[in-house]
Amino acid sequence: MCYTRVYLKNSGMELAPDAPMLRREGSSAAVCAAGLLLSYELRGKDMRKLFLALALAAALLAAGCGRSEQGAQPQTVSRPVVESAERQFTAPAAGQTVAVFDTSAGVFKAVLYPDLAPQACENFIGLVNKGYYNGLTITRVEKDFVVGAGQGADGKGTTIWGGSRYPAEYTDRLHHYSGALCAAADAAGECASVFYVVQTLPDSVSQELTDQMTAAGYRAEVIAAYQAGGGAPYLDYGDTVFGQVFEGMETVDRIAQAAVDENQTPVEPITIHSVSLSSYEAAAAAPAQ
């Protein structure tokens, strides 16, 4: 999956026929990223789209090297409690739909946002109810970036609509913060069953990236949330954010530590035993003293 190619196509930036595919692993990332940017012909003057394209390439330049060491030195990620009024950092309301991912590496839970990403949630919930994800394995692990799955035995994704994909859904109320549950879009800007969780570190948003978000017109509240919790703003408006992990992020971090092969697939399979749905139950209020 090439996140950069997906984003730029969705952004109205035209990809030249001979543009190279951008890769994240290995020292070739710098060469590919530079070649990719030079191969794009920008259409229009949307500063946010331009920022996202350049920021993604810059992030890949920084993160492209050293992937072969992944899994060698497990680390514990300390994640802060982010104080923000942004939707993804507010506690789920009682009755909200929650997806429970039971994997061989542990369990994590994500609250879904059908009001903001209706098609993504409808498709995901429908596939969960059919048991589609049960028994699948994690197929994409990029430490400090994303953990993904959702491809069937044929290596492809599917939908509840007979395989017909749905267009990616965007909103300024959902972003690629650490822990975001996202539907991956293809080069045509369409999504299916493949999903990923953003696994970036809390300090992943540099001052330079912050300055670029400001210049691109991001809301101050969004920038502050990115600064506090980390994330991948260069993926915004490319893929669909439809949920947020609120419990078990340590499991996602554990999966991200796995040793991977040249395709970023775990050497030792990590199985999704099941994905199930439940309704969030708010903690009972403490009795008055």
Residue ranges of predicted features:
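Cyclophilin-like peptidyl-prolyl cis-trans isomerases
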Residues: 3, 65-289
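Short, Lys/Arg-enriched N-terminal segments with co-localized hydrophobic residues
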Residues: 3, 9-12, 17, 24-46
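Exposed boundary/loop context
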Residues: 5, 11, 16-19, 28, ...
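Sequence-pattern detector for short linear motifs
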Residues: 8, 26-27, 46, 51-52, ...
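Low-complexity, intrinsically disordered regions enriched in charged/polar residues
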Residues: 9, 31, 41, 50, ...
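Hydrophobic alpha-helical membrane context
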Residues: 21-22, 60-61, 151
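Sec-dependent N-terminal signal peptides of Gram-positive bacterial secreted proteins and lipoproteins
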Residues: 49-67
